[in-house]
């Protein structure tokens, strides 16, 4: 199937409300992607029945002082080819309110978050891949002292225009030794740890499925000159694995190990990586 790009339009408005009157500022952008498709006999692909497909997004953000609220309106009429067909219709799946002050950052509504390398928690958006698994709930970030960053959250994961049945609870702490102890020199040290728990009610009378599944991770980042090392270990417990039968409940722990070593200088970059993932 061959596609013809009819229109890809982005509009950005930096100011819609004058800040001189102390009313705050409204920012926004609008994007629409319309595509038309034709038959491609070489791969036996047929054109879409709708002739024209469209993905459109409208973002609106209001900001005043330390306070921000925003929303995103999404329209899939119908979704572009290669997008999941469950992206269909119109709605406002993303809206939030956020307040920041003196090391405190509070968000209610939708938000994106990643702990470490994302082994046990990664809520992110990539419209090009058709991925948006934002969390809807409450997130708290706090910096009690220089170099210590704490995050706590609870929410439900977005699934297209709905939300999953499970509830995600998580906490993360990152400790930058150089910032906390005012260390000087070329070497920087950052330690981190995370904990995530998922609750999902067991509505299956045939199996004794765990309603709470937990995962934890620890990470280390060392930077020296052009060298950068990042390592993280994650462990998950109490989760079903493989097929489950009436006479056997298969529960197993999972683990993942990530090691990244990079070196860079002008005109040269070297990366060595190793990833091990089992039942995560």
Which positions does each model-derived feature cover?
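Signature for the C-terminal beta-barrel architecture of outer-membrane proteins
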Residues: 21-26, 34-53, 62-63, 68-69, ...
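Acidic, small-polar-rich N-terminal luminal/periplasmic segments of exported/outer-membrane proteins
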Residues: 76, 80, 90, 94, ...
């Amino acid at each position: 199937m061959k596609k013809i790009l009819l229109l890809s339009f982005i509009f950005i408005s930096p100011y819609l409300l004058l800040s001189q009157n102390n009313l705050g500022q409204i920012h926004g952008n609008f994007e629409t992607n319309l595509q038309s498709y034709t038959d491609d006999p070489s791969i036996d692909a047929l054109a879409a029945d709708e002739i024209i497909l469209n993905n459109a997004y409208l973002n609106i953000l209001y900001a005043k002082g330390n306070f921000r609220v925003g929303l995103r309106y999404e329209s899939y009429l119908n979704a572009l080819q290669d997008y999941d067909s469950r992206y269909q219709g119109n709605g406002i799946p993303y809206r939030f309110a956020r307040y920041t002050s003196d090391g405190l950052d509070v968000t209610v509504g939708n938000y994106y978050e990643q702990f470490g390398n994302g082994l046990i928690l990664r809520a992110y958006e990539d419209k090009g891949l058709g991925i948006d698994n934002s969390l809807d709930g409450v997130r708290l970030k706090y910096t009690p002292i220089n170099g210590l960053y704490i995050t706590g959250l609870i929410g439900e994961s977005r699934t297209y225009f709905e939300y999953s049945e499970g509830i995600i609870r998580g906490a993360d702490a990152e400790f930058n030794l150089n910032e906390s102890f005012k260390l000087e020199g070329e070497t920087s040290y950052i330690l981190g740890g995370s904990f995530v728990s998922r609750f999902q009610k067991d509505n299956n009378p045939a199996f004794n499925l765990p309603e709470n599944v937990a995962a934890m991770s620890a990470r280390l980042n060392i930077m020296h000159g052009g060298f950068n090392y990042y390592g993280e270990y994650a462990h998950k417990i109490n989760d079903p694995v493989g097929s489950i039968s009436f006479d056997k409940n298969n529960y197993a722990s999972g683990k993942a190990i990530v090691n990244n070593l990079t070196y860079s200088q002008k005109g040269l970059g070297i990366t060595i990586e190793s990833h091990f993932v089992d039942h995560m």
